[in-house]
Amino acid sequence: MSANHSKTKKKSSIGFVEGVRRSRPLYLLMLPSIIIFALFTYYPMYGIVIAFKNFTPADGIMGSSWAGLKYFKQYFNSYQFGLTIKNTIIISLYTIAVTFPLPVIMGLLVNQMKAQKFKKFFQVSTYLPHFISTVVMAGMMILFLSPSTGIIAKLVGLLGFKLPNLMGSAKAFPHIYVWSEAWQHVGWDSILYIATLSSVDPTLYEAATMDGANKWHKMIHIDVPALLPTATIMFIMRMGSVMSVGFEKVYLLQNTLNSTSSEIISTYVYKMGLVSSQYSLSAAIGLFNNIINLILLLAVNFISSKMSDTSLI
């Protein structure tokens, strides 16, 4: 029995080595990405330990004294804990509610378009905003929504109304962030769903046409089931980053007037770590944030695996 086991193990190891040898060019192409990923993603994880230490640059990571859960308790007992958690969850769930279904809907609509020229124009025009940098996008929002010189303010003024200071409104901030995010990325995110629909067997549509199905029936009974596995995987991945709202755009659009709704975990970590030099506190907050994301990812993945055959793991 042991001889057979060792023989099988030897064969599997030989098979792995042989597979690597045959695919050597592919592994060499992967090597730079693996090295970069290891250096900038896995190696910095060593610094997580400062969340449990009274870290100072002078003492270094190893020389700093242990603090236990001191900085976690400091964050949990602070006023900013409830505020940052609430704002992060509101903006994140609002973003998912808008930007997750819209690419699916756009993919379904594009798949139904028959005029090829209009279809290409529509796709290109919706993809282009994705290539606008976050800094430029934030600048555009500030310029457009300026109550004195903004384009929207002037258009509203022609109708006899006055545009309020939306960038200074805590209530308006989540809407500005989410809908600018949708305008910028929905078209690009729909590419995955359009590609999925392009792989659907054309004979299914032909059979449905022969059975008297219209476009709506084809969409519901052919297109939507074809998209469900892809959409499920994307939803699981989105739920795994619920607590990680994009820092750049929020920080660029943030000001003292809207900070009660724009102060999220990532901006607070930046202010504590790089502005106030409270490295241990910022590391503790970041670690807490990542643990919550991991728990959500595993929970949603578990539910998905029980309810369907689709899961990440």
Give residue spans per PLM region.
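A structural signal for multi-pass alpha-helical bundles of membrane permease subunits
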Residues: 19-313
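Short, Lys/Arg-rich, polar N-terminal cytosolic tail immediately upstream
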Residues: 1-19
